[in-house]
């Protein structure tokens, strides 16, 4: 994966956002805000298993209807945020969002501040999900419209069958890791399995897959025996 540095004349070097994927299962997330912006963030986070608490004086009915989250209709006290792994500031007031962002940064808490990427320690990407296959798209906060268009383009390119293919490849990768000692041969074997699937509309037939793996098992064993 490549980290790209972009030069901005007069401002020195700015680093593009690194696309790091985080396991959110069971993570405590506090969303401050009860409107449409907060709703979009909540829907994104909830899919990935986060434990979400929403704090706002007024919370929209759509958020209240979401199962599995805690809703507190009150003003937020900053010290409550210390209990969170991640904080999302998505109120309608920029001054409150900025206050939350500054507090979280001072406390070392990951925070996303609506409409303020300078205060945000992470951004919400446009997401395409096919089971365990997750693709995120971001323009570094420059243009949500561009990010949305690219997300939709990629979404059309990736068929639903990739969900099953990804899970199958996970199982075959485990087999290859155990039975093919050569990293180079193992990579060749797994690449060939994907090519076989793509030639068959993303369907990986078990019989064909085992035939491919058996070929590489034998080649790997022969190489080791000759040493």
Q: What are the residue ranges of the model-derived segments?
A:
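E1/E1-like adenylate-forming module used to activate ubiquitin-like modifiers
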Residues: 113-162
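ADP-ribose/adenylate-binding Rossmann-like module
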Residues: 86-90, 97-123
